[in-house]
């Protein structure tokens, strides 16, 4: 079981009190809060390696590119992706969803194809698919939630077709 208090301690911003209660941040699709380890790594990077990647041969550019590609390799390994070049970094979830809807969706979905979302989606995971439906003629379906507030898995199974 995850120790929520221990995890919260890794996030300096969550030490704040708002309206008399500990801060809770639930809008991470566009901007996620950073744990201390990430903040420290960013500071080290800005102090030692800050440069454009894949754009130069000088020391800092080479160092930054090497670090960037090393992270791509580690990410591929962690995700079980055989080719690190298949890993694409985006600035946030919102940008990633838009990229998938535009690049993959436009190339692979057409009239009558079905897209299944849930009624629990963040706004950033609804609009790109609505726009895709408008461009392609695909059909958008929504899976509901149970009275207990969880995803209705039976409804999901019924919405996913051949």
Positions of PLM-derived features:
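Pyridoxal 5′-phosphate
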Residues: 1-162
